[in-house]
Amino acid sequence: MENLELQKVANEVRKDIVTALHAAKAGHPGGSLSAADLFTYLYFEEMNIDPKDPKKADRDRFVLSKGHTAPGLYSVLAERGYFPKEDLVTLRHLGSYLQGHPDMKHIPGVDMSSGSLGQGISAAVGMALSAKLSNDSYRVYTLLGDGEIQEGQVWEAAMFAGARKLDNLVVIVDNNGLQIDGKVEDVCSPYPIDKKFEAFNFHVINVADGNDMAQLRAAFDEAKTVKGMTTAIVMKTVKGKGVSFMENQVGWHGKAPNDEEYAQAMADLEKVGEALCQK
């Protein structure tokens, strides 16, 4: 799929995110929106997957380590055809299979339940090691938040991945600079992120704009050429990307839009869509 078409899909994913959160009246828009382009690139371009056979043995695996941004994952899964888009508005509702964090037992396309920060990357490392031991060809991708990497478990997993030279694993960090309590650098700075992963024998790819499809494509194309090292892609993004009043605002880490805010958010995204159609 061409980059422009991927951008259009990502904009639809953002609309789905906002719509689901508005219906839920709770959840995490900021980090879901910042990673919408990444979700789109993975599921529409990068990964070997089949929505009609979500458990096929040779599929690539994805683990959402920052599990609170499940609305982003659910939205791209729906757009990709894993389940009906209409189900997105049941997010967090009693009896819905789409709860606040991913559940691998109930949601088609989810490879790992996640939510407790730091555990997702550990699971992804285990999947990658399993593939190596079984001589399987699938690749494993995991997405972490920059606030999440304050968790010590992240670095235990990174140490193991680097030591085992798991070149079938790609660790992605959504570096949007904000977490629930404020700026990541003020709460407990993990910077420079790239140097830390390099210290654990990772091949590191810095992406200046993780909301740009061309830059994401270049990063993942490079990752596929790396042998004998795990790859970390550290992408700078905008928290709340696409919605004017949410962008770079820490208050939108974990708050759903009310009716007025929802209308404004959808108007913003409609304008983005119109601009993309004119290109």
Language model features by range: what are they?
Residues M1-E5:
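Non-catalytic, mobile gating and regulatory segments of ester bond hydrolases
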Residues V9-A26, D174-N176:
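N-terminal capping segment at the start of a domain
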Residues I17-A20, S32-A163:
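Cofactor-binding active-site loop characterized by glycine-rich and histidine/acidic residues
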Residues K25-L33:
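Structural motif
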Residues H68-T69, L73, N176-G177, K236-G240:
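Glycine-rich beta-alpha junction loops
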Residues R80, V187, E247-G251:
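Short secondary-structure boundary/capping segments
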Residues G109, S113-S116, I121-T225:
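Thiamine diphosphate
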Residues M213-K279:
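Glycine/aspartate-rich loop-and-adjacent alpha/beta segment that forms the canonical ThDP
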